[in-house]
Amino acid sequence: GAVARGAYEARIRELIEHCDPVFAMSIEVMLDVRRALLEGYERLHRVLLQVVQHDPVCRRLMTVPGVGPVVALSFKVGVDDPHRFARSRTVGAHFGLTPKRHQSGTSIDFEGHISKQGDISVREALCEAAASLLLRVRKWSALRAWGLRIARRSSMLCAIAAVARKLACILHRMWVSETDFHVGFGAKITQRLRLKPAQ
């Protein structure tokens, strides 16, 4: 069954108590490595939280439901200079969140899966934020309502990709305009950007 993080090592030691000594020693070494990795992760996470806490751009981006410290910092680092994008709607394409377009001389054009071009870490962070907004956040917002409509019409995976693309546009717009998120923010920008759900 499920074992709490704090009780994991104790449970493993209990299981290997009567095992072969060489096998038990190798497991002990792996437990030591695991503990060191977790401690290092926790230290790095505390540093990240301090960086975000003192960064006005990250704090602004975190006003969007589903966007936490890691997502905010990943997006800021990935974009670097927001003014290099003339239009907010192009940011999603930069991170590979727009559908690929298939063309031939004899058939009708159609859109496929997202292109997955650009920085994969930023794309994954945006998708994680989109999934959090749709599946965990309960507070209403125009952006969440838009995503849930796509989920009902198509699938949750399509909705996550579409909301991630929209988030890229919204986060960029907020950054450039120095505007915090509000629950109706997605309504106007949805209409203006005319984004299509990913396939």
Give the residues covered by each predicted segment.
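Low-complexity, acidic/Ser/Thr- and charged residue-rich accessory regions of DNA metabolism proteins
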Residues: 106-110, 144-199
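Conserved acidic
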Residues: 29, 33, 118, 155-159
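Intrinsically disordered or highly flexible coil/loop and linker segments, enriched in small
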Residues: 21, 43, 50, 135, ...
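A residue-level signal for conserved active-site and pocket-lining positions in enzyme catalytic cores
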Residues: 37, 126, 167
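Short alpha-helical linear motifs
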Residues: 51-56, 94-101, 111-117, 169-171, ...
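Glycine-rich, often acidic, oxyanion-interacting loops/wings at catalytic, nucleic-acid
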Residues: 1-60, 121, 164, 185-193
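Phosphate-backbone recognition surface of nucleic-acid-processing proteins
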Residues: 60-63, 69-156
